[in-house]
């Protein structure tokens, strides 16, 4: 089954990490990517740029309204997403658990265009 692993983090928290801890987190992620690639479970990763450069688009009175950045109320923003192909939700959650020291991680099954889980 294919899953997406959504990693949310607070940019201020990330910037405040000591360099050694930031390096450790990056190493953990890179090592996990290598492990999942070797096992055939890793499909892709997308790291997202600084959210201050994002635009949020919402329909207001029938007209698209564009605002800078992500939703203002949110402290955590989507930082990256991984696409994986594993045997079960339990395995996807196991992988997500390795990514959580300074982030919130959400796991969702992917669906095809017909709405069937992949």
Predicted regions and their residues:
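Conserved, structured core segments of small domains
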Residues: 1-118
């Amino acid at each position: 089954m294919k899953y997406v692993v959504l990693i949310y983090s607070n940019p201020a928290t990330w910037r405040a990490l000591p360099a050694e801890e930031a390096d450790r987190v990056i190493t953990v992620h890179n090592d996990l990517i290598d492990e999942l690639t070797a096992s055939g479970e890793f499909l892709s990763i997308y790291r997202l740029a600084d959210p201050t450069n994002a635009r949020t688009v919402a329909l207001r009175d029938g007209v698209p309204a564009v605002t800078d950045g992500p939703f203002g109320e949110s402290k955590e923003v989507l930082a990256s997403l991984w696409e994986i192909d594993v045997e079960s939700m339990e395995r996807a959650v196991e992988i997500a658990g390795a990514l959580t020291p300074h982030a919130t991680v959400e796991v969702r099954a992917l669906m095809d265009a017909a709405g069937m889980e992949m």
